[in-house]
Design a protein with these regions (language model features):
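Membrane-interfacial amphipathic/re-entrant helices at transmembrane-helix boundaries
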Residues: 1-18, 46, 57-61, 87-92, ...
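Transmembrane helix-bundle core of multi-pass membrane transporters
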Residues: 83-84, 88-158, 185-188, 250, ...
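Helix-loop-helix "hairpin" substructures at the membrane interface of multi-pass membrane proteins
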Residues: 11, 133-211, 234-239
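Transmembrane alpha-helical segments in multi-pass inner-membrane proteins
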Residues: 15, 55-67, 190-197, 201-268
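Single transmembrane alpha-helix segments in multi-pass membrane proteins
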Residues: 2-52, 79-86, 91, 226-234
Length: 283
């Protein structure tokens, strides 16, 4: 049981890292990026090809992949989101959803539907924690994801720049009056949120298969975590992501692996039934 609990905890840290990137974009810019899972897929393919062609381990290429995905996030904002912001909200929803479909289909064409995985990486093997053996890739990825989330929290809640983000999230017009550019902040947030999912995606390749639709499940779970934690709440998304990982692991251990995702959605429905704004949402 404790082995499953540990696995769920470290998987939950990865879910949390992906969810926090989505929550950051949603909370500051008031836009739901339905292509978030496909951004993770791009990051996984980037790390895979860095390893295959350049022999660069994903743990080492992760910062570069994060930068690349940050640029993808900037382009998405500059070319799509910015142009649609003054239109109906449904236009942006459909645009990001359509972008996800396009990216997934392009991946099918370019890389085929084959499942790919990396052989031995620098974090391959297992470690023993309190007498329980667990895969080293999951531990390393989970810990790096935790450090990344802590760094994001410090940036958002403990720096001047973070205060500017919160000001834009609270009231764009007032923020503009005091010299804060909402447009610049939005672009930076899209870059940062996309870089976060890029880092998580690169690290995932150390133990997870890479295929065109890999981002679908992770994107969906990130969306569930953000909604469950409280719309746009970074601490809420973080805690909900960990909770999802643990619930999945415990369901797989005590009930059946096939019901892992079902249990997450049952919990999701119960949380929103009791607290419609999520665990940390404002009433």
């Amino acid at each position: 049981m404790f082995e499953a609990l540990y696995a769920g905890l470290f998987n939950g840290l990865i879910y949390a890292a992906v969810a926090v990137g989505l929550a950051l974009i949603w909370g500051i810019t008031d836009v739901i990026n339905f292509a978030h899972g496909e951004f993770l897929m791009l990051a996984m393919y980037a790390a895979y090809w860095f390893f295959t062609l350049g022999h660069v381990d994903p743990t080492l290429s992760a910062p570069l992949v994060a930068i690349l995905l940050g640029f993808v996030g900037f382009l998405t904002y500059a070319l799509i989101i910015k142009r649609l912001q003054k239109g109906p909200p449904m236009a942006i929803i459909l645009a990001t959803f359509g972008l996800g479909l396009v990216l997934r289909q392009l991946a099918f064409i370019a890389f085929t539907p084959d499942y790919r995985n990396l052989p031995d990486t620098m974090v391959s093997g297992s470690v023993t924690l309190a007498g329980i053996s667990i895969g080293r890739p999951q531990v390393v990825t989970g810990l790096i994801a935790l450090l990344m989330v802590i760094a994001l929290f410090i940036l958002v809640y403990r720096t001047r720049w973070g205060h500017a983000l919160q000001a834009v999230a609270e009231d764009r017009e007032v923020a503009a009056l005091v010299g804060i550019s909402p447009d610049r902040v939005n672009a930076q947030v899209w870059m940062l949120g996309s870089a976060a999912v890029g880092l998580a995606g690169a690290l995932l390749t150390t133990f997870f298969y890479v295929f065109p639709s890999v981002g679908t499940v992770f994107g969906l779970l990130a969306f569930v975590a953000v909604c469950m934690g409280g719309f746009g709440s970074l601490p809420g998304a973080f805690i909900a992501g960990i909770l999802i990982g643990i619930i999945e692991a415990m369901t797989g251990y005590f009930v059946a692996p096939a019901l892992k995702t079902v249990s997450v959605f049952i919990l999701f429905i119960l949380v929103l039934w009791y607290r419609p704004r999520g665990l940390f949402g404002r009433w």
